[in-house]
């Protein structure tokens, strides 16, 4: 049944940006001479930029920090968010339908908001959102159930009145623990977790087409 509010992840959920993010991550690691595993994006995506830098230092012997890493990746891929990154199939139609029926919408992302706003302005959807939140606004990651409870407070709603969409098993697990209705979204970079997401999320979808029942 329809909910009162909807929270969406950004990268890999609403926009098909993960190939660009992966390019930036792998370029950074190559520039440091790191022989990274094939599933590096599955490992670091839930960590955010500071957490990813910590992971590289611990596992690859680097001595980088989150700001240095963020600056490198941002400078490399920012232009793609401004000019190329597209919405995933059915996203525009779904978001406009939600607003038409009076739902409140929010973004909750580990990505810098300087990526989100110009991308959504270009795609014509920024004005559909009541809130655009970064994890930094809550001082915690999306792997922490508390962040969803704090978001619910900002909506002045109970958690079970909110639907949450993400392509990350870690975020979906945390949101479900917080009591939100969870919707897993397929993304190529997270395909190894499809079985887990199908079991964990209340609903798992290939894309946003024909989902007006949620």
Map each language-model feature to its residues.
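N-terminal helical cap/lid subdomain that shapes the substrate entry/recognition surface
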Residues: 2-97, 101
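Short, flexible loop segments at the rims of nucleotide/cofactor-binding pockets, characterized by
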Residues: 81-86, 110, 182-184
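Residue-level detector of anion-binding/catalytic polar loops
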Residues: 35, 104, 181
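Conserved phosphate-coupling serine/threonine residues in phosphotransfer and NTP-handling enzymes
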Residues: 13, 109-111
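Conserved SAM-binding loop
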Residues: 14, 87, 105, 140, ...
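Asp-based, Mg2+/Mn2+-dependent phosphohydrolase catalytic module
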Residues: 1-4, 96-99, 113, 117-214
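Short "lid" loop at the C-terminus of a central beta-strand within the Rossmann-like core
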Residues: 46, 112-113
């Amino acid at each position: 049944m329809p909910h009162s509010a909807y929270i969406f992840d950004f990268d890999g959920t609403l926009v098909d940006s993960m190939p660009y993010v992966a390019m930036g991550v792998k370029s950074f690691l190559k520039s440091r001479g790191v022989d990274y595993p094939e599933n590096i994006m599955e490992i670091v995506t839930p960590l955010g930029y500071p957490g990813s830098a910590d992971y590289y230092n611990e596992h690859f012997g680097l001595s980088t920090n989150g700001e240095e890493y963020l600056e490198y990746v941002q400078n490399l891929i920012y232009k793609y968010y401004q000019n190329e990154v597209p919405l995933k199939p059915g996203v525009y139609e779904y978001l406009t339908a939600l607003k038409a029926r009076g739902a409140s919408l929010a973004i909750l992302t580990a990505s810098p908001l300087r990526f989100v706003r110009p991308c959504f302005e270009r795609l014509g959807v920024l004005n559909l959102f009541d809130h655009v939140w970064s994890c930094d606004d809550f001082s915690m990651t999306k792997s922490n159930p508390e962040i969803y409870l704090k978001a619910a407070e900002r909506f002045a709603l109970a958690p079970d009145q909110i639907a949450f969409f993400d392509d990350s098993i870690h975020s979906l697990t945390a949101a479900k623990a917080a009591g939100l209705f969870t919707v897993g979204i397929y993304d190529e970079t997270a395909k190894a977790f499809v079985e887990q997401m199908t079991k964990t999320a209340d609903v798992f979808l290939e894309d946003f087409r024909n989902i007006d029942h949620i």
